Regions:
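Basic, polar low-complexity surface loops/patches
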Residues: 1-293
C-alpha cells in the first residue's frame, strides 16, 4: 500500500514539475525511491537515477524478473547521506520531493517536508553565488486605439541566497515583436537563472514552441505553466503579499510595492513567490522589497 501511494505521488509531481522529478520517501533509516518500467507503464526514472547516484537498483521481489506496480524497481541510501545525494540530483537539474517520517515507529506518519530544486536550494555558502529564479508572464492584448496586438511581459527575479529581487514590465506594439523577445532575452541573460517559470493565461504547444524559438532556453531548467486564477483576484493578491511584507503602514501591499499600475509583473511576482514558498516555507522570510529593473 505504501509503495502504491508513493507511485501515485511520483506521477503527481512529475506532472507538476516535469520528468526530472524524484520523490524520496523515508523508510526507517533510509530514503528510498521506486519506479516501474515495463511495456505497459513507466513511472519515474529509477534506472537513470541509480546510475547518476552510483547506487544499486533492485526489485521488491528479486526472484521475479519482471517489474510492475506490485514488484517495483527500487533503490535507496542512508538518511545521513541525503545532503550529498541532493547535491548530485540538483546539479543534474532534478526537482526532489522529500517525504519524511514525522511521528515515531512502528506506524509513522509521513509528510512532504521540503521540495528541493536548483533555484530554491539554499546551502551553507562561503563564496557567494547567485541563486536566481525568474518568472516570465506573457500576455497579448488588443490596443483600443489601433485595434492591433500589444505584446506585454512581466518579469520577476529573486535571488534566494540574498533575498534581493527585481521586477520589470514592458509592452511593445505589433511592429516591435522582435524587440519584445530581445528584451526578455536580455533580462534572462543578465540574471542567468537556475530555474525559469514561463506563464501563459492559456498554454498550448504553439505559444510554448514560439517562446522556445525566440529566446535561448538551451541548458536551462524551465517550467511551463498556466497562471493560477487566484492570482488575478485583488483581495487574494494583497492577502498573500501581506504574509511576506507585513509592515506597509496605511498602504495596501500592492501600493507599498508600487505595483498598482503594473498588473502583469504582479502576476509574475506572485507566481514566483508562491513557487518559492511551496518549495521551502522558510525561504521567503528574508525577501527584500523588490527593485524595478
Amino acid at each position: 500500500m505504501l509503495i502504491h501511494e508513493y507511485l501515485d505521488q511520483q506521477i503527481e509531481y512529475e506532472e507538476k514539475y516535469g520528468k526530472n522529478t524524484l520523490v524520496l520517501m523515508q523508510v526507517g533509516s533510509f530514503f528510498e525511491f521506486y519506479g516501474v518500467n515495463n511495456k505497459e507503464e513507466k513511472i519515474g526514472n529509477p534506472c537513470i537515477i541509480t546510475e547518476l547516484l552510483n547506487i544499486q537498483l533492485t526489485r521488491r521481489n528479486k526472484a521475479i524478473l519482471e517489474n510492475s506496480r506490485d514488484n517495483c524497481l527500487m533503490a535507496g541510501f542512508p538518511c545521513h547521506a541525503l545532503k550529498r545525494f541532493i547535491h548530485i540530483l540538483l546539479d543534474n537539474n532534478y526537482t526532489v520531493v522529500l517525504i519524511e517520517q514525522v511521528t515515531p515507529p512502528p506506524n509513522p506518519k509521513r509528510e512532504i517536508t521540503q521540495i528541493f530544486s536548483p533555484g530554491t536550494y539554499i546551502d551553507e555558502i562561503t563564496n557567494y553565488n547567485p541563486n536566481n529564479i525568474v518568472s516570465l508572464y506573457l500576455k497579448e492584448e488588443i490596443c483600443y486605439k489601433t485595434n492591433k496586438n500589444l505584446y506585454i511581459f512581466g518579469l520577476s527575479c529573486i535571488d534566494l541566497s540574498t533575498g534581493k529581487n527585481y521586477l520589470y514590465e514592458a509592452s511593445f506594439g505589433y511592429y516591435d515583436k522582435n524587440a519584445y523577445y530581445e528584451e526578455i532575452y536580455r533580462f534572462i541573460e543578465t540574471f542567468n537563472p537556475k530555474e525559469l517559470i514561463i506563464l501563459f493565461e492559456k498554454m498550448n504547444d504553439e505559444n510554448r514552441n514560439t517562446i522556445k524559438k525566440k529566446i535561448n532556453l538551451e541548458n536551462r531548467l524551465v517550467h511551463f505553466t498556466e497562471c493560477d486564477k487566484k492570482f488575478y483576484q485583488n483581495q487574494y493578491q494583497n492577502t498573500f503579499l501581506k504574509k511576506i511584507f507585513p509592515n506597509n503602514g496605511q498602504l495596501s501591499c500592492i501600493e507599498f510595492l508600487e505595483l498598482e499600475r503594473k498588473p502583469y509583473v504582479l502576476i509574475s511576482y506572485l507566481t514566483l513567490l508562491d513557487f518559492s514558498h511551496e518549495h521551502n516555507k522558510l525561504i521567503i522570510q528574508k525577501i527584500k522589497k523588490p527593485e524595478f529593473w
